[in-house]
From Swiss-Prot:
GO cellular component: chloroplast stroma
SUPFAM superfamilies for this protein: 2Fe-2S ferredoxin-like
Naturally occurring in which organism (per UniProt): Spinacia oleracea
InterPro entries recorded: 2Fe-2S_ferredoxin-like_sf, 2Fe-2S_ferredoxin-type, 2Fe2S_fd_BS, Beta-grasp_dom_sf, Fd_pln
Family listed: Belongs to the 2Fe2S plant-type ferredoxin family.
Organism phylogeny: Eukaryota, Viridiplantae, Streptophyta, Embryophyta, Tracheophyta
Name used for this protein in its record: Ferredoxin-2
Amino acid sequence: ATYKVTLVTPSGSQVIECGDDEYILDAAEEKGMDLPYSCRAGACSSCAGKVTSGSVDQSDQSFLEDGQMEEGWVLTCIAYPTGDVTIETHKEEELTA
């Protein structure tokens, strides 16, 4: 399945199509978006974002605590969409504050 992923960045929103077997960060890069990342393995906070609607599967991640995921935090480098989803990007500072 393919879902609509709305990425809300500091420079505006962009909607991309992302397959349920494709990491959101990878799909965004294919569309020419410049999103932050570092390890690409779900083990740091560089690519952190916040889900404001919809849901993702990020079971490959090893950095976020359960409580943070319940609050909507997401690591875009290892997150698959499980439906249409809206994510605020560039949130590392807020997560680690």
